[in-house]
Amino acid sequence: MAFNPELGSTSPAVLLDNAERLDKLVNGPAADVPDRGGDPLYSWRQMMAKNDEIRQNIIPLSKQYATLAAAQADIANIPEGSTTYYRSPDDSALAIEVMNVGGTLTATGRKMPSSQAVDSVRGLIDSQGENPFSVVFKNGLSPFGYKDGRLYADEFQKLYSSDAGLEFGGSIIDNNPPDGWRFVIYYRNGLVMCGQRNDGTMIGFGEGGSGGGSIEPGDTAADYDSIRNYTGTATVRDVVGQRTGGRFVVNPDDTTSGEIPGGILVDVLGRRWYRQAEFVSYDMFMAPRVPGATLLAVQVALAMGNRSSAIAYLSGVEAADAAIQNAHRYANLLNIPVRQNDGAFLVLVDHEAEVRTKTSLGGSIIFTSADSGVNEIRWGPLRLLDPTAPEPKRMFNIKGKERIELTPAELATFNTSYSQYLKKGSNYLPYPKLYPYYGGMFYALSNEVEIYRNGNRDNPRDRVLYRDFSRIGRNGALTERIVKDIPTGSIGYAAIIPKEDDFLEFECPHFIELGDSRRFLNIEVSRPMVRIKNLVHTSWQTASTSLESRVVISAREVFDVFCEYGETTCHPAENGSYVICIRDTCNVHIDNYYGLHGWGFQGHHGIKGLYGNRNTFNRVDFHSFGYDVFFKDLTVKGRQINLQGGNEWSIEKLRLYITRTSGDAVEYFLNYAIGMRQDYASDCDGILNIDGVTVMWDRGLPAWYNTTRSFDLVRIIDSANSLDQGIDSKLPPTITIRNIVFDLAGIQTGRPNDNFEFCAVTALRSQFTDYAVTGRKTLLPDNITVDGMTAINVQPIQNAVMCGIKLPADLYQNTVGSRNKKGSDGTNARITLRNLHSVINNPSIELAAAQTVDIPGDAANWTTDYLNSDYSWIPRITLDNCIPAIIHTPGAKAVVDIHGGKLARVYTNGNGNRCRVTSADIELIPDASGVTYFAADKTLVTGCSWLNPASGATYPGTLRGS
């Protein structure tokens, strides 16, 4: 009985048996050795022999012989019974197979056919009218095929399908031919392959009547002129060339189109040859590249800071504008993408490229130089105000469906029956013409002026007309609410911007501009639903010339614009230039953008819904009409944020870098971070929320604090002109600021000055214009809340005083400054300051020098109107856990409540302002003469601890309370 235990056994007998068998398999002479079940196993010698046999059989298969004699001479390497091939001596075959039979190569009868043989057989088939193509079932029936110049389906009675047709492999058979056709077959790009018209004309077959001829392959062409000069019968030709190569096919339906060099070629017979492609590139349209040596020279010159040499190197390079425009024209025609992912090109921006399809230019470079664009300010036409102003030069203009503009008759009807719905707070416009355009946008522009910029009534371009816009809902609903009270019956222009069928994506090249004072737009967005990605921009402009109206990305009267990833730089001295400029647009998203040194974001005359994430800008500007603006993780370096508009403004995690902008000169406005745009009446009637702010200073700055007493996070009124701009100045009704840190690591030794304040909210004037003269109100905030404010890296002998609210000495002049009537306590505004922690290393502060609440002035100036008006702005100020609380309120009526923290001063100059203090420490801080200030007659103290005054001073007065 065979020794055959179960697999997996670990008995000593099994292990010994395995060892003996392995020794025989590896070292024994036998060809095979039985396993423990009795079945033979190949030994190592047997396996090596088999491998050699296989190798010998493979050798002849890898060899090719020119003649039979050459193969016979190598018979030693062709094993007995193996086959090999030698080249046929004539055109009857490509190669002939032979076998080694007893040392002699003998023909097997098998041959590899040549192309000539295949062509001969095909010719015989054609001449006999047989099927060059057929579908054959297993039973031998051929129900479908092509013969005698026609498609046939003899065995089919009917082919049924739904209205959608049949789809297979990504292709579709549709049972509803287009108008004018009995049947037609299209290429994927829309060109007709073949078909039959209703009048019986055959297209694309041998006897076609439209001049198209048959679909015959042609030879290759060396260049486009070879196709232009071609007179043969072929309708398919291949251009062979570096970067320009591709297949061209005659379009028999097109007899009128002009050439698009590289896309549509017209031959001497008048046929139109269309490029067949899944996408096109600028190279295909013969866009001249910047030669490699020139590009290297330009890059080296720029690396050395030699801009003029770089311009000189590019002066001999041919511009690529026309080729770029042609590439997009052809892509638009066939609805295919444009891709150019390498190469460098020079553009003069003489005409714009119209973009209607997905575009990918990442990896390529577009230069502009001393002759690109124009050397003049061009903001473009203004509807109704300056309609004939020259258009700006544009490099790319992204377009979509045509807008629907209301006719004069439709405007008259709208003004009579529907314009009354365009009032602030409305989300309803029952205008029937809007109903079919659900999801689009309605835009209305009034003939009436809302604002005169800077009070200028002479220049039409300084007039801001009433306007409003919103996306269209169902049956009269509006997505965005109306924000303006447009005068009824005043609409002078209105349009519907339709919703697109898809989002268009534009991936940017690296834009490099060299010329000074050259104005143009890189990308104009003239259609909604656009994604602009991966912008890289470098400017070598100098500081000596203006760049006003220079814009990289512009969008106007559209919606759903997404700007994703950007790196843009320019010179710091340039004003009026922006990396992104948005006008009259809904729903804009800007993410991961870096726009410094003169570049920033501008919401100019109209934006609803701006969402920004992780951006770094030189400045953020809203000239007029910014509504619902939300920034997260925003860095502003060098300048500031200017606001105008309303609804809600929200900024989370804001970093401010205060630095020089031009040599050693730092502009005046750099002593504040967020301001209300003065040239538009400081009008910002919305909620302002700021959460998480860090402010830092450049160590190399000059003594910027010598000419000003504060740095203001939010400045609600500045010190500009007081001209009547046509509207009331409506400051944010609610301001909420949380978690502010002033990092003073960059402040010079011995600074800031002792009379310096770090302010949360500041007004430098009580009125934007004099109400008694202009009749224009200045409405101050109803509610101000500051929660969490301190400084770090303060020098050991310096103070850093946190000021929650700083108001002007002329507050009494604004007798209509409140939106609300006074309450029973005599106040109509609320200011709440929590957790303001000043750093006091030198406990000596002069009177009116630096305080937590700063309302200077003299009660002797108060007028009867100020005291008696129900709408004089009178705040109730609450301080919670502020250390120290320094109260300075001689200039205006106010009520002050202090809870917790540490009280250092209450000064009213005897104006009767009340103050209540609960659960606080009281440690008075004297001035340099040791004088302390505490208005004991109007200050009621409850549950507080009295500490000795700081710096060894004494308090000679009394306390009132318990």
Segments (PLM) and residue ranges:
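Surface-exposed receptor/substrate recognition regions of extracellular proteins
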Residues: 1-362, 366-368, 372-474, 480-505, ...
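Short, charged, low-hydrophobicity "junction" segments
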Residues: 51-59, 119, 394-425, 453-457, ...
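Extended interaction regions within the primary functional domain
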Residues: 87-90, 137, 405-406, 452, ...
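Intrinsic low-complexity repeat tracts in disordered regions, enriched in small/polar residues
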Residues: 130-150, 168, 189-191, 196, ...
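Surface-exposed or flexible loop/turn and strand-edge residues in extracellular/cell-surface modules
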Residues: 81, 130-132, 141, 146-148, ...
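Extracellular beta-rich repeat passengers
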Residues: 176, 366, 370-380, 512-517, ...
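Short, glycine-/Ser/Thr-/acidic-enriched flexible segments
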Residues: 11, 32, 91, 242-244, ...
